[in-house]
Amino acid sequence: MGVPTSDWIYWCRLCARDDVVYKVRERDDDLVRIISKCFDVEMTLEEPELGSMLCEECYSVIGQLITFSDSVSKVQAIFELLRHSEPQDSQDLDALRLEYGLPPACKQDLEFLDIDDTEDRCSLVEELTISDHSTSPSPDFEAQTVRTRANLKQCNSDPKVLASPTASIPEVETKRSRRQQFAAKRNSKVYTATESDDEEAILDEDEAVSPPPLKRKRGRPKGSGKQKNVDDSDNVTSREPDDNAKSKQDDKTSELSMSPHGSQSSNFVDYPCKICNETFMSFMALRRHKHDMHGGPKKYVCDHCGKGLKTFTSLVEHQLVHTEEKPCICPVCNAGFKNKARLRVHSQTHGEPKFECNVCGKKLQTRAILNKHKYVHTDERRFKCEVCGSGCKNSTALKIHLLGHTGLRPYVCKYCGKAFASNTNCRSHKWKKHPELASKEDETESSRVPVPTLEELRAITREMAKAKQD
């Protein structure tokens, strides 16, 4: 859960809660599309822009809507394929479902529908004889209650009653009534009277006959005050588990809460992706990452490198990688970036360190840097070199290592022309060999140079290894 705030611009855009955990951005096209389609709320598109924050509850609901929408699209594609297939064609339906990312066919076991016929018929007799509380009571209500009890006793003891025309109503209707009763019992949270309470109420009505009730307002149930007194003790006990459950939930989510300055507490919990080892702050963020990056068909293919992407927006953003265009410029150091998301992450490096390591206490500017730093305290080397087999603790170290295999030295000292594989070594060289010139450098001047990505370096070194084997 997020930290409550009094600034309304940071409230949840859908429910106005102040404990927000997620900010909707322009690149979250699925979120923006679903919210616009279902609720007619144009997030990130207003002029002037309103708040685009979501609380954990709303973010979870929208995530389920996105997943359900994708599932519906897959199902419609399957139906279109089956509709245009010939009747004599044999289709492996299970394989077809798996091809479109759907689980194998399964039947849901509804236990509450497996009810004894005797119980169904007895409950039907009870429904037919007891008048509804929402209707105005008849004058002979007490006599009708006595008849109801007699009918119930006869239903439980005499098998002839079960064979009567009243009890021989089709089984479908009885199951439907039982299903409605089950849904009503499950949805009720406050007024849950037990069978013993109902029997006591009937006995009280038999012993003391109340005067004819006064005419009440329309829609108000008869005996609401009495029902409230009967269930008063149950209400007290029923609220206690809710409070306990809420306190447990708060304790569980407090570990993920952030400080008022935006920094994460030392007791943070990471949710790692088992496929790419990227970590996330919440389970919902991890699930969305798996859905966007590792799940579903990738129908948009890049013309330059053949990479498949799930959305057209992702394709347009990816195609910037193959160009020199960097439309997003940092106002502090004039560094250029392909999209606003990378610029937003980079802008955090110019601020005060906010993310604290819970092992050594070191503070870092961004969460990504913190995640890389945490592997300093472990012996795990997840990133392996395919050429020499050596391991690195993070992707940056592997990238520098692969640059050494390729012989590329993209970082060049502008004072003496010496080239380096990493920008850190280049900056260190400037301060050691050219301290006077380095101190006069313009800090706003961008020092970034085009460097191959980690995937491109892996492809280059893989081809080099094949060439050596041949």
UniProtKB/Swiss-Prot annotation:
Residues 237-254 have a biased composition (Basic and acidic residues). The modification Phosphoserine is found at S168. A zinc finger (C2H2-type) spans 271-294, 300-322, 328-350, 355-377, 383-405, 411-434. Residues 1-103 are annotated as: Required for homodimerization. InterPro entries: Znf_AD, Znf_C2H2_sf, Znf_C2H2_type. It holds the Pfam family zf-AD. Residues 214-225 have a biased composition (Basic residues). Signal peptide: none annotated. GO terms for biological process: dorsal/ventral axis specification; maternal specification of dorsal/ventral axis, oocyte, germ-line encoded; Toll signaling pathway. It comes from the Eukaryota. Zn(2+) binds at C12, C15, C55, C58. It is found in: Cell membrane. One of its GO terms (molecular function) is signaling adaptor activity. Residues 195-208 have a biased composition (Acidic residues). One of its GO terms (cellular component) is nucleus. Residues 255-265 have a biased composition (Polar residues). Residues 156-265 are annotated as: Disordered. Its main location: membrane. Keywords: Cell membrane, Developmental protein, Membrane, Metal-binding, Phosphoprotein, Repeat, Zinc, Zinc-finger. Residues 10-82 form the ZAD domain. PROSITE patterns: ZAD, ZINC_FINGER_C2H2_1, ZINC_FINGER_C2H2_2. Homodimer. Interacts with Myd88 and Toll. Acts as an adapter to assemble/stabilize a Toll/wek/Myd88/tube complex; required for efficient recruitment of Myd88 to Toll. Dispensable for innate immune response; plays a minimal role, if any, in the immune defense against Gram-positive bacteria and fungi. Involved in dorsoventral axis determination. This is Zinc finger protein weckle.
